[in-house]
Structures are given as structure tokens and as C-alpha cells.
Amino acid sequence: MSASLIRRGLELLEAPGQGKAPPALQQGRDGTRPAGTARRRKVTAGPGKNKATIKGRVVKSAIEEYHKKKAVNHLKANLLYMTSGRCVADKAVTQQVLTQNRGRKSKDRPAEKKEKKKPEGTVFTEEDFRKFEREYFGIP
């Protein structure tokens, strides 16, 4: 890992409200370094503008992103909303909605009653058949 990633991670983990110690209280190393290095270190140490990013881009905090996407429980707000408004619709409106939604699927329709077939009776009587037999077959 690079030093900048570690530094950024430590900045995320430090408690909010706790900043860096003032420069007078920071423990410094021996002062044998050239003046240019100390100046460069002071410039990069502050939480200033990150020069390594694209122009206009803001560096996002991972913790803030996590809190944005964390699941929120809306139960209390929903219960309050549902219980506060006791608006009951008219009977005619509810009946109209029910009739519009009913009967579109075949399973919602009541079964049609089939008519019972009556046994087919003959129009002719037994006497008519005998008469026909005599005429057709010639049986006396």
C-alpha cells in the first residue's frame, strides 16, 4: 500500500472533532534536513486540496458513502402515516373498483350451470308405430 492510501485511511478512522495536534506540540525529528523538505512536508501534511485528482472532482469519504447506502427503517413513519389518515372511501366507489377487478380471470368467474338434457321422448305413440309397420311392411 502506498503511504497516501494509509494516510487517507487513518484520516477516515480518527474520531470526528479530533484534529491534528498543533505543529508546536508535534514531535519532530532531528533538524538536519534541508529547509525545502520541511516546507514540502508542511504543504502535503495539511488536509488541503488533493492535487492528484481530476479538476472539479471531490474525493468521497468511504464512511459517508456507507451511511448514505445503509438501509433505513421506515416502519415508524409508515405507521404514523397510515394511522393518522382515516379517510374511508364511499361504498359506491369501493363497489365499482371491486366490480372492475372481478371477472377478468377465468378462475374468478362462477361456474356456469349446465342444463340437464331431458331424455328425448318420441312424438309418435305406440299405435302410430303399429300403423306404420302395417303400411310399410304389409304385416296385417
From Swiss-Prot:
GO cellular component: nucleolus; nucleoplasm; small-subunit processome
Basic and acidic residues bias: start-end ranges: 108-120
Coiled coil: none
GO molecular function, one term: enzyme binding
Main location, first listed in the record: nucleus
Pfam families per UniProt: AROS
GO biological process, one term: ribosomal small subunit biogenesis
Region (Disordered): 1-52, 95-123
Transmembrane annotation, as ranges: none
Alphabetically ordered keywords of this record: Nucleus
Top-rank taxon: Eukaryota
Localization, UniProt: Nucleus, Nucleolus
Function of the molecule: Part of the small subunit (SSU) processome, first precursor of the small eukaryotic ribosomal subunit. During the assembly of the SSU processome in the nucleolus, many ribosome biogenesis factors, an RNA chaperone and ribosomal proteins associate with the nascent pre-rRNA and work in concert to generate RNA folding, modifications, rearrangements and cleavage as well as targeted degradation of pre-ribosomal RNA by the RNA exosome. Acts as a chaperone that specifically mediates the integration of RPS19 in state post-A1. Direct regulator of SIRT1.
Family to which the UniProt record says this protein belongs: Belongs to the AROS family.
Complexes and interactors: Part of the small subunit (SSU) processome, composed of more than 70 proteins and the RNA chaperone small nucleolar RNA (snoRNA) U3.
The name this protein goes by in its record: Active regulator of SIRT1
Originating organism: Gallus gallus
Lineage: Eukaryota, Metazoa, Chordata, Craniata, Vertebrata
Designated gene of the protein: RPS19BP1
